[in-house]
Regions:
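Alpha-helix termini
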Residues: 102-107, 138
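A conserved beta-strand element that flanks and buttresses the S-adenosyl-L-methionine
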Residues: 114
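Hydrophobic adenine-recognition pocket in adenosine-nucleotide-binding enzymes
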Residues: 118
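Glycine-centered flexibility motif
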Residues: 67, 108-109
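Local beta-strand N-terminus motif with an aromatic residue
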Residues: 43, 109-110
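Class I (Rossmann-like) S-adenosyl-L-methionine-dependent methyltransferase catalytic domain
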Residues: 1-43, 47, 52-103, 122-126, ...
Length: 221
């Protein structure tokens, strides 16, 4: 669930949402996460769960086979117009619940599954469904990268206040994110990040896979 009351309702409009994202530095943040965690390569399959207006596409290399879906018809309509003419980009209206029982072919064997700020809009049951869909979509060698807001045990009052302003009503603590992810994935790591954009927001990156992965600690730059 999310809070779209009052001024937050404006963010349901794609152009206002994108303008806000640019103001807070979300474009730079996505690029930094792409460089360090997504590591997508041309020709790979990417599934974007809760894709919004399709902003993540701009941070993927050319030639990626991309499928994104979202419950918002307004966001999907905007995404389709933005990437019209690119046969490698597909946008679908729907939720994880719509696809979990019968995964469409284009969503299978993904090298990368991305969730950019989706899970904190979902209750535990809905979030588990999204994580299970991500697991089902992954190729054996693939990996999931989810970027979310988080509460920390040691966190500045300003950061905690700012995270609490989020439209999503299910921002979780770091231990809660780990517990949730561990119900679906045996192999995952989490990384907390600050200074990713122009706000005091605290992020957590959840990187999960079907098989153990080994790489160095993230250097965000």
């Amino acid at each position: 669930m999310q809070n779209d009351s009052g001024i937050r309702s404006l963010l349901t409009q794609p152009w206002i949402y994108n303008a806000y994202q640019n103001i807070v530095g979300a474009t730079r943040a996505r690029q930094r996460v792409s460089n360090r965690f997504w590591r997508a390569q041309p020709g790979q399959r990417v599934v974007d769960i809760g894709c919004g207006p399709g902003n993540l596409v701009r941070h993927l290399p050319a030639g990626v086979k991309y499928v994104g879906f979202d419950v918002s018809e307004e966001y999907i309509g905007h995404a389709r117009r933005s990437f019209e003419g690119d046969p490698d980009k597909t946008f679908i209206v729907g939720s994880a619940e719509n696809f979990i029982a019968d995964l469409p072919g284009p969503m299978r064997n993904a090298d990368l599954v991305v969730m950019g700020g989706l899970l904190h809009h979902l209750d535990d049951g809905e979030a588990l469904t999204a994580l299970r869909l991500a697991r089902a979509a992954l190729a054996p060698h693939g990996h999931l990268v989810a970027l979310e807001g988080t509460f920390l045990v040691r966190q500045s009052m300003l950061s905690r206040w700012f995270v609490g302003l989020d439209r999503g009503r299910n921002v979780r603590s770091e231990p809660e994110w780990k517990e949730l992810t561990g119900k679906v994935f045996d192999h995952f790591e989490t990384f907390t990040l600050t200074g990713l954009d122009r706000t005091p927001y605290t992020y957590i990156v959840i990187e999960a896979s079907l098989q153990p992965r080994s790489h160095a600690q993230p250097q965000i730059g």
